[in-house]
Amino acid sequence: QNDLLAENIKQRDKFLKKLAVEYVIMGKECEAANMKEAAIKNYQKAIELYPSISEAKKKLTKLMNR
Protein backbone atom coordinates (compact mmCIF):
# COMPACT_ATOMS: atom_id res chain seq x y z
CA GLN A 1 0.00 0.00 0.00
CA ASN A 2 2.89 2.37 0.71
CA ASP A 3 4.22 1.68 -2.77
CA LEU A 4 0.86 2.58 -4.27
CA LEU A 5 0.73 5.79 -2.25
CA ALA A 6 4.27 6.70 -3.27
CA GLU A 7 3.41 6.05 -6.93
CA ASN A 8 0.27 8.19 -6.66
CA ILE A 9 2.28 11.04 -5.16
CA LYS A 10 4.90 10.71 -7.89
CA GLN A 11 2.22 10.81 -10.61
CA ARG A 12 0.53 13.82 -8.99
CA ASP A 13 3.81 15.72 -8.82
CA LYS A 14 4.54 14.91 -12.45
CA PHE A 15 1.09 16.18 -13.46
CA LEU A 16 1.46 19.38 -11.41
CA LYS A 17 4.86 20.04 -12.97
CA LYS A 18 3.33 19.67 -16.45
CA LEU A 19 0.56 22.10 -15.55
CA ALA A 20 3.08 24.56 -14.12
CA VAL A 21 5.08 24.43 -17.36
CA GLU A 22 1.90 25.28 -19.28
CA TYR A 23 1.35 28.30 -17.05
CA VAL A 24 4.94 29.43 -17.71
CA ILE A 25 4.30 29.16 -21.45
CA MET A 26 1.11 31.22 -21.09
CA GLY A 27 3.04 33.75 -19.01
CA LYS A 28 5.62 34.12 -21.78
CA GLU A 29 2.86 34.57 -24.35
CA CYS A 30 1.26 37.26 -22.19
CA GLU A 31 4.61 39.02 -21.83
CA ALA A 32 5.07 38.97 -25.61
CA ALA A 33 1.62 40.57 -25.96
CA ASN A 34 2.50 43.25 -23.35
CA MET A 35 -0.06 41.85 -20.91
CA LYS A 36 2.03 42.27 -17.76
CA GLU A 37 -0.69 41.55 -15.17
CA ALA A 38 -1.82 38.38 -16.93
CA ALA A 39 1.80 37.22 -17.22
CA ILE A 40 2.33 37.80 -13.50
CA LYS A 41 -0.78 35.78 -12.65
CA ASN A 42 0.33 32.91 -14.87
CA TYR A 43 3.79 32.80 -13.29
CA GLN A 44 2.26 32.96 -9.81
CA LYS A 45 -0.04 30.04 -10.64
CA ALA A 46 2.90 28.03 -11.97
CA ILE A 47 4.74 28.59 -8.68
CA GLU A 48 1.64 27.70 -6.67
CA LEU A 49 1.29 24.40 -8.55
CA TYR A 50 4.98 23.50 -8.52
CA PRO A 51 6.98 25.67 -6.07
CA SER A 52 10.40 24.56 -7.33
CA ILE A 53 9.82 25.79 -10.90
CA SER A 54 12.74 28.19 -11.18
CA GLU A 55 11.89 29.66 -14.58
CA ALA A 56 8.58 31.03 -13.31
CA LYS A 57 10.33 32.54 -10.29
CA LYS A 58 12.93 34.25 -12.49
CA LYS A 59 10.33 35.57 -14.91
CA LEU A 60 8.10 36.82 -12.08
CA THR A 61 11.00 38.59 -10.35
CA LYS A 62 11.99 40.24 -13.64
CA LEU A 63 8.44 41.44 -14.29
CA MET A 64 7.94 42.73 -10.76
CA ASN A 65 11.12 44.81 -11.03
CA ARG A 66 10.03 46.57 -14.23
Specify the residue positions occupied by each region the protein language model found.
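Conserved structural position within tetratricopeptide repeats
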Residues: K14, I47-E48, N65
